[in-house]
Amino acid sequence: MYTYSVAKKDGLSKFKIRKGADRKEIQYWRKHHDLHGWMEKLYRQKGGKEQSFNCIPLLLTMEDLANLQKAILTNDLPKTTGFFFGNNPPDEESQKQDLHFIATAMYEISQGRKVYYDSWW
């Protein structure tokens, strides 16, 4: 699971970036299942229809990031389980890392870039 920013022109839609777009990595997570569950819920709210939320870029807005920040600070990420996730509940260190990601992503957006979440397994 990872996030990256692309130039505004390369963010084609909520779920698509231009092929070959230059991606600037923001954050990489390994087995942060509750965060992925939150992102999958957001994907569905934005109209995502694929049964499996995997290898699908998800555009994140300032509002999305503010809502995620609130969920992290109130320990309100959805409990998410599954074969690929294992059992690694969020802790103080992962919370710090998540909040740093949000600040960086907000900065990227403020600089005119688009930020996407993606996963692959």
Which positions does each model-derived feature cover?
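Acidic (Asp/Glu-rich) sequence patches and key acidic residues
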Residues: 1-121
